[in-house]
Design a protein with these regions (language model features):
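Long, contiguous, compositionally biased segments that the model treats as domain-scale units
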Residues: 2-147
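Non-transmembrane, aqueous-exposed alpha-helical and coiled segments at domain scale
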Residues: 310, 319, 325-357, 363-366
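Proline-rich intrinsically disordered, low-complexity coils
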Residues: 5, 9, 13, 31, ...
Length: 366
């Protein structure tokens, strides 16, 4: 973990590197500082993975979610793997998300904003810095962006070259996602056929048979009215956005660019970036860094987050109260959510912050 120089958000002008003046939680202890600098320099010369206009479009869609006119679906891996990277795995993850989105769109009657935990989710926060097996104690596995999961000294040593490898895998993943979502793979009729197959071949899928049948009737009605489902861009293509935990700050800084049209700063590693429960300190490096980029942001909040802290995070990350800028991801656990969530809803709403509220059912909620 980085040390904390005497600096506060109120006295430090923001820059892509200003986070370095703050305490940075959950950072690896890179053994070779020069190798890290070289990796950062290389990343800084590589093309952006996403563009400012895309981030603004996602913010606009999330504003509809905040105002009750759309629904947010975010799904994907807890942490992506270098070892399990293939076109088939990317296609299958996208396919599942599209299937969920179609069912949700029909059931809710509103557009579904589709965000994947993909093309960058290569790092994970850890409760302990080391892991012990038998008599051996090594650095903990922090995700393939940092080290390897094999339990030996060399594999667990943080390697800055993995930052560059993560970029290239993210770029390849994004290339496929864009081709799939704009090239016909996401066609509504095809996604509906996948859902029908799921219903027919799975006992679990039979629970959704009624919804699938209703969607089928709706599509046949549209066709009967003369609507060419294949010719409508809105039924043939979809927007699909990427997201990840902006955990490893040297990587995020190196991929931050200034928009040539607006002079705004944007983190070009993903469309949406989030801050985790372990890194959301108001005076910490992660909040400092993300406060200055125009990407839509999210913060995970758990049982230790007080109403005052939630409001302070909103003030720090979205002082202009821009709808769609900030999402709060709750992770209280099913036994505590009824007691802990309402005070936060009241405090944030009372301060007139137009946030998107979403639940992470996989972390802290089992």
């Amino acid at each position: 973990m980085a040390s904390a120089p005497a600096s506060t958000p109120a006295t430090t002008p923001w820059s892509a590197a200003s986070w370095r003046q703050f305490a940075a939680a959950q950072q690896p202890q890179w053994p070779d500082a020069e190798a890290l600098k070289q990796a950062e320099a290389q990343l800084a010369t590589l093309p952006p993975l996403i563009f400012a206009g895309e981030a603004r479009r996602l913010t606009s869609q999330l504003a509809d979610v905040a105002n009750g006119r759309a629904f947010l679906l975010q799904a994907g891996d807890c942490a992506e793997s270098f070892a399990e990277f293939s076109a088939d795995s990317i296609r299958d993850k996208l396919k599942i998300i599209l299937q969920m989105a179609v069912a949700l769109t029909y059931a809710a009657g509103v557009p579904v904003v589709k965000v994947g935990r993909i093309a960058g989710q290569f790092a994970k926060p850890r409760s302990n810095a080391t892991e012990r097996i038998g008599d051996a104690e090594l650095d903990v596995f922090r995700g393939h962006m940092v080290n390897d999961d094999a339990f030996d000294v060399d594999a667990r040593r943080p390697d800055p070259l993995r930052l560059v490898a993560a970029y290239h895998q993210a770029a390849s993943t994004l290339n496929l996602l864009r081709a799939f979502t704009k090239g016909g793979f996401a066609d509504l009729s095809q996604v509906h056929q996948w859902n029908q197959q799921f219903v027919a071949s799975s006992a679990e899928g039979q629970r959704y048979e009624l919804v699938a049948s209703e969607i089928d009737r709706a599509l046949r009605f549209m066709a009967a009215c003369g609507i060419d489902l294949g010719a409508e861009d809105g039924l043939h293509q979809v927007d699909f956005w990427t997201s990840h935990d902006a955990l490893i700050l040297p990587y995020e800084e190196a991929l931050t660019r200034q928009d040539s049209l607006s002079d705004d700063w944007i983190d070009c590693s993903a469309h949406l970036l989030w801050i985790g429960e372990r890194t959301r300190q108001l005076d910490g490096a992660h909040v400092e860094f993300l406060s200055g980029v125009i990407n839509p942001l999210a913060v995970k909040i758990g049982p230790n987050c007080t109403p005052d802290e939630a409001v302070a995070l909103c003030e720090r990350l979205n002082p202009g109260r821009e709808p769609g800028r900030l999402t709060l991801i709750t992770r209280f656990g099913r036994d505590r959510v009824e007691d802990l969530l309402p005070p936060l809803l009241a405090a944030v709403g009372g301060a007139d912050h137009p946030v998107v509220w979403t639940c992470d059912p996989m972390h802290g909620n089992t």
